UniProtKB/Swiss-Prot annotation:
Reaction(s) catalysed by this chain's protein: L-seryl-[protein] + ATP = O-phospho-L-seryl-[protein] + ADP + H(+); L-threonyl-[protein] + ATP = O-phospho-L-threonyl-[protein] + ADP + H(+)
Binding site for ATP: I142, G143, E144, G145, H146, Y147, G148, K149, V150, K166
Biased composition (Low complexity): 49-77
Name this polypeptide is given: Probable serine/threonine-protein kinase DDB_G0282417
GO MF, one annotated term: protein serine kinase activity
Native organism: Dictyostelium discoideum (Social amoeba)
Top-level division of the source organism's lineage: Eukaryota
Taxonomic classification: Eukaryota, Amoebozoa, Evosea, Eumycetozoa, Dictyostelia
Keyword DNA repair: no
Active site residues of this protein: D266
Length: 528
């Protein structure tokens, strides 16, 4: 069976080389190692440079230069470094160990193993005939891998012939920004702790995943009872796994968003891996709460691992990036609406709290899929969410009809999250799964658009709930505690969401009264 590569403490270097021609496996190269980095120059480039130098010397000695040779000589003599500077820039993270990801990855290369591209100089020369140009946008491809391309956008103001010089100057400056480029690709370093390697996300083999103890959350949600029992999980049913999974997801996301200062941008079921064998015994990670599981006081790995950082972006990288289509910033992703997934369509730019919103969607989907339709608990959850959206329940409507109505309502609510809709007071029975209130909190987070760090810091460190506590930090099970996820020190009540839970009278059936508005979320407990 395929065994996962151990990326712990694995150093990452970067291949940085320049080329006028695409680099192929068969291309002869000159290789030099400098400071544990490998510099590759294709032999063709060296031969061309030597030929150019020889031609220049011959031309200078003979003094028989035509116009083309004069132009070439002037360019080579005046811009001795420009020939290399205008070549393609390739920054490739390289592991010291040999790994293989998929079928296209070469030995020792990871993710960004494709050669970069630049616009043809001749094409730039053709643009010089335009007399006036206010702004010219030029995209430089700085990386390409399994999950798309990453561009660096250059904006130059120009008029007439100066356009050519400015664009060439911008390309030369790219070669001097190696440190900045490494910051862009620094997301690849996260694979050492946050990336679970498989043979390919699109073709994960169920037997291999079970053999090594990991399954994707998407697989876990789509299993039937027979498949789930074959996993030999210590849990008797999947509903028991909800709290441990969410707890571990929050810790992993905390490590990504806060500690490493990244936004994942693609948090979905297929990119979350769960170790079902350690989920029941794993305690909250002490210290930093790293998603790798290496806390200051514990050697236990976090049972939930985030994967596929192809869309991740470092928050403080001072380079503007474009998506695959060259659009500024990143557009939000589209998730399809079926039994296991929501359909979320929005054209707004992704912000640093996008991962928080995706986490709320995951909780919503886990709730509806871990509890099968037709059961009493599932029906109660669906009815509650429908009431939350102000939808009256038809007495003759069955679980499937209510579920379909809920999908439409929830999808519309997300799509119109900037609306000024005022929700009404809801009274419902307390026998519903407590996790249902959490999705309301996350929806409220996204409506108020708080900073991602505020939410995660509150989830992890609010009151006594820290990474040293075994209780899931997003659940409050002590009647003396308050749940203040935004800012515990804030004097503005409208910016604080309270969630309290009284479990002292387990035999009683209390009634919950929830008042939900766009600016506040209060939950009071009234025993009948």
């Amino acid at each position: 069976m395929h065994q996962p590569s151990d990326f712990t403490n694995l150093d990452v270097n970067f291949l940085i080389f320049q080329s006028n021609l695409p680099i192929t496996n068969n291309a002869p190269t000159d290789i030099s190692i400098v400071n544990n980095s490998i510099n590759i120059l294709p032999v063709e480039i060296n031969n061309n440079n030597n030929n150019n130098n020889n031609n220049n010397n011959n031309n200078n000695n003979n003094n028989n230069n035509n116009n083309n040779n004069n132009n070439n000589n002037n360019k080579n003599n005046n811009d001795g470094d420009d020939a290399a500077a205008t070549n393609s820039i390739n920054v490739i993270p390289v592991f010291e160990k040999t790994i293989q990801i998929g079928t296209t990855t070469k030995s020792g290369h990871f993710i960004l193993d494709a050669t970069a591209e630049v616009n043809d100089i001749q094409e730039i020369e053709e643009n010089k005939d335009f007399i006036v140009r206010d702004t010219q946008q030029n995209r430089v491809l700085i990386g390409e891998g399994h999950y798309g391309k990453v561009y660096r956008s250059m904006y130059v103001s120009s008029d007439g012939r100066s356009l050519v010089n400015k664009m060439l100057k911008g390309k030369r400056e790219c070669t001097k920004e190696v440190e900045a480029l490494i910051d862009v690709f620094d997301a690849s370093k996260m694979v050492t702790t946050q990336y679970f390697t498989t043979l390919g996300f699109s073709s994960i083999i169920m037997e291999n995943m079970v053999d090594i103890g990991y399954v994707t959350l998407k697989q876990l949600l789509s299993m039937d009872d027979k498949q789930f029992s074959a996993l030999a999980s210590p849990f008797t049913c999947r509903s028991q796994m909800i709290k441990p999974i969410i707890n571990a997801m929050v810790i992993a996301l905390y490590s990504v968003n806060i500690e490493k200062n990244y936004t994942h941008f693609d948090l979905n079921h297929g990119n979350i891996f769960v170790n079902i064998h350690t989920l029941d015994t794993c305690q909250s990670i002490s210290g930093s709460g790293s998603g790798s599981g290496s806390g200051s006081g514990s050697n236990t790995r976090n049972p939930v691992v985030l994967g596929d950082f192809g869309c991740a972006r470092k928050m403080d990288v001072p380079i503007r990036l474009c998506d695959t289509n060259g659009h500024e910033n990143y557009k939000s992703l589209e998730r399809y609406w079926d039994y296991n997934q929501c359909r979320i369509k929005t054209t707004s730019f992704i912000r640093d709290n996008e991962d928080i919103f995706s986490l709320g969607v995951l909780i919503f989907e886990m709730l509806l899929t871990f509890v099968h339709p037709g059961t009493t608990l599932f029906e109660q959850n669906v009815l509650f969410l429908l009431k939350f959206h102000g939808i009256e329940i038809v007495p003759t409507g069955g679980p499937n009809n209510n579920y379909t109505t809920l999908k439409v309502a929830f999808s519309n609510d997300i799509r119109n999250f900037t609306s000024n809709t005022q929700f009404t007071t809801i009274t419902f029975d307390s026998k519903f799964n407590p996790i249902i209130s959490q999705i309301i909190n996350y929806i409220q987070y996204y409506r108020n658009r708080p900073n991602s760090s505020q939410v995660l810091e509150s989830l992890i460190n609010n009151h006594q709930y820290s990474l040293n506590n075994n209780l899931p930090p997003i659940f409050v099970e002590n009647p003396n505690d308050k749940y203040e996820p935004v800012d515990a020190n804030s004097s503005d009540d409208s910016s604080v969401l309270y969630h309290s839970y009284d479990s002292s009278d387990a035999d009683d059936t209390p009634s919950f009264e929830i008042t939900i508005t766009r600016d506040n979320f209060n939950q009071s407990i009234n025993h009948q």
